Amino acid sequence: MQEIKITRAEQRKEKPDSSKLVFGKYMTDHMFVVDYDEGQGWHDARIVPYAPLQIDPAAKVLHYAQEIFEGLKAYRTADGSIQLFRPMDNVRRLNLSCERIALPEVPEDLALAGITELVKLDQEWVPYEKDTSLYIRPFVIGLDPTLGVHTS
């Protein structure tokens, strides 16, 4: 499996009050990104500071909605350790969706390693309160900058 390069955020965001969490409102300090092209496959795996994505205006995701997403949770156990809820099931569903819309499947070991490393790096975002969790939203988008119906 390829190495995942980590670039830490220089400034950390203020964490929300765990008693007032709102789904989808707060983003962690980092994100996991991997590039793909036919020649190299999935490459340049990295965890970087959370930031907007730069997308070509002709990207497939914008014109043909070529994208998929999944969702899983990281939560704290009674002893304070962090667990992911069924991460391999999540990765398999992600790849099944990729197959269905002709996006390249992400190697399972790479996806799991990226999610795991991201949660380790941003572990202070996983709340301690009962019935709370950190929601993780893996997604794959078609970025091929061409118009016309074909795979990205």
Report each predicted region and the residues it spans:
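Conserved alpha/beta cores of soluble small-molecule-handling proteins
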Residues: 1-152
